[in-house]
UniProtKB/Swiss-Prot annotation:
Protein's name according to its UniProt entry: Large ribosomal subunit protein uL30
Gene that this polypeptide is encoded by: rpmD
Cellular component annotations (GO), alphabetically ordered: cytosolic large ribosomal subunit
Short name of any one Pfam family annotated for the protein: Ribosomal_L30
UniProt similarity note: Belongs to the universal ribosomal protein uL30 family.
HAMAP family for this protein: Ribosomal_uL30_B
GO BP: translation
GO molecular function: structural constituent of ribosome
């Protein structure tokens, strides 16, 4: 069975944000506005998305 994935797009700038939020975006493979990353649907990835929810948009959510 195929592993579930999430597509996440960066919609906010990390400029003037806490260093931990900038590092979280890097961990999500996002480094420029409007970039899209396809990530595995795991609790750790969902936690990272929740931490920077104001900077990213989930494009399709399988769950």
């Amino acid at each position: 069975m195929a592993e579930k994935t999430l597509r996440v797009q960066q919609i906010g700038s990390p400029i003037r944000r806490e260093a931990s939020q900038r590092q979280t975006l890097i961990g999500l493979k996002l480094n420029k506005l409007h970039r899209i990353a396809e990530l595995p649907d795991t609790p750790s990835v969902r936690g990272m998305i929740a931490k920077v929810h104001h900077l990213v948009r989930v494009l399709d959510d399988a769950a």
